[in-house]
Design a protein with these regions (language model features):
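Sec-dependent signal peptide recognition
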Residues: 1-8
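N-terminal signal peptide c-region/cleavage motif recognized by signal peptidases
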Residues: 11-13
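Zymogen propeptides
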Residues: 16-114, 186
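Extracytoplasmic
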Residues: 49-52, 81-82, 118, 149, ...
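Beta-strand-turn-beta hairpins that frame and shape the catalytic cleft
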Residues: 50, 127-131, 177-184
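Short, surface-exposed charged micro-motifs
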Residues: 54, 122, 174
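Active-site-adjacent helix-turn-beta-strand microarchitecture at beta-sheet edges
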Residues: 91-166
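Conserved, well-ordered active-site substructure
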Residues: 97-116, 165-173, 177-216, 221-252
């Protein structure tokens, strides 16, 4: 009986962390050195497929901002009007359209840090660059230009985070950083959180960008990504409902 259970758990683990491989990848240039990367992957274990859209940028030439959106404006409209180079939907909000967790917009705190099981990290921009920190690592004593609390953590120290849900599949939005000041905003087709963490930690979807940390943003019908091409046209995955805030990237 114990052997049967052991085999069951081994099979479950193999399913959760099946081998994902890149079947195709294309990159295109945007302004200020931002790159849009379109990646298709296949899972050798179960034949599953996933599509990733990434906007890769440098903290040296770009600034990350959190955009409050109390009126429920669409991502594409906001990005075009304010001359952003790329952006995604932001964090969680409640049934009354109020943000859940920390929000710092233009160096002003709109809502405080919240202790909760799901929103375990903070994406922030400071003079030190773009960072993803654990909620317990967050300090209000440093000069912070923008911050949003979200989660769960997907990758830490280039290793996938364990214990993530593997049964619920949905569109996902996420942010990832590496050690040399580069970061990315990302969207992916319907995968579980465990699958997303596994892909980010084990496949080179961002080419030569080595992901050090990654964190989940609001997903499902909220997921959206927008990118301005170098020629002035745009690539866009629209949200399916209004969202409370956005994560955007501007030229410095």
């Amino acid at each position: 009986m114990r052997l049967s259970w052991a085999l069951f758990f081994l099979a479950a683990a193999a399913t959760a962390h099946g081998e994902w491989t890149i079947t195709s990848a294309e990159s295109e240039a945007g302004s200020t050195g931002v790159v849009h990367r379109h990646v298709l992957l296949e899972n050798a274990t179960d034949g599953g497929h996933a599509t990733f859209e990434l906007a890769i940028f440098s903290g040296k030439s770009c600034a990350l901002r959190i955009i409050d959106n109390p009126e429920g404006e669409r991502l594409a409209s906001m990005m075009k009007r304010e001359n952003y180079v790329c952006g995604v939907n932001g964090g969680y909000f409640d049934e009354e359209f109020k943000p859940i967790g920390l929000r710092i917009v233009n160096s002003q705190m709109l809502t405080p840090l919240k202790r909760a099981r799901l929103i375990t990290g903070v994406l922030l921009a400071s003079p030190r660059g773009v960072q993803i920190v654990r909620a317990r690592e967050f300090s209000q004593h440093q000069k912070i230009e923008a911050a949003i609390q979200c989660g769960p953590f997907l990758v830490d120290r280039s290793q996938r985070v364990g214990g993530l849900n593997n049964s619920q599949h949905a569109r996902r939005t996420f942010v990832a950083t590496e050690t040399n000041e580069r970061a990315l905003l990302g969207f992916c087709s319907e995968v579980s959180l465990a699958e997303l963490a596994n892909i980010l930690a084990t496949t080179p979807i961002a080419a030569d960008l080595k992901i050090q940390r990654a964190i989940n943003l609001d997903g499902g019908s909220s997921s959206a990504l927008w990118f301005a091409r170098e020629n002035g046209s745009v690539f866009s995955v629209p949200e399916r409902k209004p969202v409370r805030d956005f994560v955007g990237v501007l030229p410095k």
